[in-house]
């Protein structure tokens, strides 16, 4: 759900007079542990795995997709050097067979699989294909993830006088056809995990002409909507906007050939339609929307060493008892406030009124954890216990409380009252009954604090577009990890990246010009200045992460609401692996079978 800018963030800060950097940063070095994914075998059981995609898709281009709905499909068609197997957070090699890392953590040399074919007649994957694909990520006007390669991982490159990336200068070298050497500006604690993200996937060199030096072998819109070419276990079949998408088994896949013949996603955003589709057995593996979910029907039979719960659920409406999986994935769902359009007292009043625990229990039926930080508990500095302790002791708007009197007082102090009410609009994404209920509860509470809050809904893709254009006041969104460390989340609260007047901001809050915003910007610079996978750098990062959380508390830019427990249900004919903390959107289906 983030966006890109082709301007280096460091250069942007210099150009705009950003806060001076200090010395602090961190991350989860454990996230760089890897294993090797074995290829060969597979294929056979056939049939179509029928799924539900609960959001509108926007594109099939890996560097342009910023929404989970598109990402679910892209994950099946495009392979990268690394991968999160079944959404676990220990990365594996994928198109790489192994790698070497320099002692100073700045040079990575990857050995590629030989003979790994692209779909169609585009030959095998080579190092030159990765150079081309990563140049697109950095330089293409279609890229919304340029900051991943230019800033987050920080591959060496040159910039022009305005701080923009100078095309063709990435320090990515093809030593030979099957050896790729990558040089970073400085060490980064999550290099291997970020390379598992599909924005770094391989495309055939020259397939598109959206960067310098290439005319392209097909039109961009054809690739992005009708004929995406990758090296994944499935190849594209169809995508009908707001209807369905389908991929089919790629028989020459370099890894384990898919068991199923095809995977089909019906695109449905409405909760009632989702549940009806699943109850009619049109979906094999599916979510159950909260309005139709009964926690008393869950029977947990096993909890593994990663805390994943498995068992059964039912009976459901059609009389069946289905399989159950519940995983505390790494995510955060929140209300974002455009600070240019919603005054601070109103934002604070919303925080006073919001009782996150009440929302989880009464609206979400216990399917998650109340959120008081944007950083999820399982990657918060010090872990879940530290998360809870910091929130209990320091959250300024009432931990597990609704404080209407304080909400009313902050608005009266700002000059509002019964005859002078403040008004703003909260936009939620269409089809979400739970967000609609949350919005209604907040609206009713704020009515007692001299605030008239309007509620509107918009399709997910429309909400994102309006956000990028700065045309939202308050909005509901969520963020699911790209790599398992706090900086992947807190980049959304880095003030320079929230400016909607810039090219594709990462969030839509326009946070600047306040003491808290300045502290957050300074803290994020400290994070950037301490990127190494060392204990010292991690301690520095951890300090800055907490500073950013507290700065957000002060200005209420994001109002955290909940951390979701991802649950999936499936009929007895499906044999599917458990997904991990990276979530089901990172799971590949080539090992899934239909009986």
Residue ranges and their predicted role:
Residues 52-101, 229-230:
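N-terminal lobe/hinge region of extracytoplasmic solute-binding protein
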Residues 343-444, 547, 593-594:
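Append "and occasionally in soluble cytosolic enzymes with long acidic Gly/Pro-rich linkers
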Residues 17, 241, 398-404, 408-482, ...:
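Ligand/substrate-recognition segments at binding pockets and active sites
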């Amino acid at each position: 759900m983030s966006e890109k800018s082709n301007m280096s963030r460091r250069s942007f800060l210099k150009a705009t007079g950003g806060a001076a950097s200090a010395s602090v940063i961190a991350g989860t070095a454990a996230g760089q542990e890897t294993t090797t994914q074995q290829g060969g075998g597979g294929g056979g059981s056939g049939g179509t795995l029928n799924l539900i995609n609960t959001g509108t898709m926007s594109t099939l281009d890996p560097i342009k997709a910023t929404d989970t709905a598109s990402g679910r499909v892209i994950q099946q068609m495009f392979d990268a050097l690394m991968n999160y197997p079944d959404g676990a957070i220990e990365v594996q090699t994928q198109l790489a067979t192994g790698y070497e890392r320099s002692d100073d953590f700045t040079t990575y040399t990857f050995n590629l699989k030989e003979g790994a074919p692209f779909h169609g007649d585009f030959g095998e994957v080579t190092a030159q294909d990765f150079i081309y694909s990563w140049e697109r990520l950095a330089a293409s006007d279609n890229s919304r993830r340029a900051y991943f390669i230019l800033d987050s991982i920080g591959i060496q490159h040159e910039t022009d006088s305005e701080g923009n990336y100078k095309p063709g200068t990435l320090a990515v070298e093809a030593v030979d056809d099957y050896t790729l050497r990558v040089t970073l500006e400085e060490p980064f604690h999550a290099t291997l995990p970020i390379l598992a993200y599909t924005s770094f996937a391989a495309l055939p060199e020259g397939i598109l002409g959206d960067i310098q030096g290439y005319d392209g072998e097909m039109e961009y819109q054809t690739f992005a909507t009708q004929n995406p070419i990758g090296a994944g276990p499935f190849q594209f079949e169809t995508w009908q906007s707001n209807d369905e998408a389908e991929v089919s088994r790629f028989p020459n896949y370099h890894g384990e050939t898919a068991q199923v013949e095809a995977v089909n996603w019906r695109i449905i955003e409405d909760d009632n339609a989702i549940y009806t589709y699943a109850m009619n057995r049109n979906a094999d593996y599916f979510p159950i929307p909260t309005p139709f979910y009964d926690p008393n029907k869950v029977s947990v039979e096993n909890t593994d060493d990663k805390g994943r719960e498995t068992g059964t659920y039912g009976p459901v409406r059609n009389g069946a008892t289905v399989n159950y999986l519940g995983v505390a994935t790494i995510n955060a769902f929140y209300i974002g406030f455009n600070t240019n359009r919603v005054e601070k007292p109103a934002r604070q009043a919303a925080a006073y009124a919001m009782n996150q625990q009440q929302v989880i229990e009464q609206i979400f039926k216990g399917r998650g954890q109340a959120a008081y930080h944007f950083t999820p508990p399982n990657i918060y500095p010090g872990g879940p216990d530290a998360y809870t302790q910091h929130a209990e002791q320091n959250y300024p708007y009432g931990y597990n409380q609704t404080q209407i009197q304080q909400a009313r007082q902050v608005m009266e102090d700002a000059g509002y009252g019964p005859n002078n009410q403040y008004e703003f609009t909260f936009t939620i994404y269409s089809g979400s009954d739970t967000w609609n209920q949350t919005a209604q509860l907040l609206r009713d509470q704020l009515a007692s604090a001299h605030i008239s809050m309007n509620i509107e809904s918009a399709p997910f893709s429309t909400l994102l577009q309006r956000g990028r254009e700065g045309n939202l006041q308050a909005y509901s969104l969520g963020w699911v990890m790209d790599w398992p460390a706090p900086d992947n989340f807190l980049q959304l609260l880095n003030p320079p990246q929230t400016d909607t007047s810039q090219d594709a901001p990462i969030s839509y809050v326009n946070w600047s010009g306040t003491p808290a915003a300045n502290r957050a910007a300074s803290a994020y610079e400290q994070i950037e200045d301490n990127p190494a996978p060392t204990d010292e750098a991690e301690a520095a990062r951890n300090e800055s992460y907490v500073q950013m959380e507290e700065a957000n508390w002060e200005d209420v830019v994001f109002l955290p609401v909940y951390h979701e427990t991802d649950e999936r249900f499936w009929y007895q004919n499906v044999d599917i692996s458990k997904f991990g903390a990276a979530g089901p959107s990172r799971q590949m289906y080539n090992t899934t079978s239909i009986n």
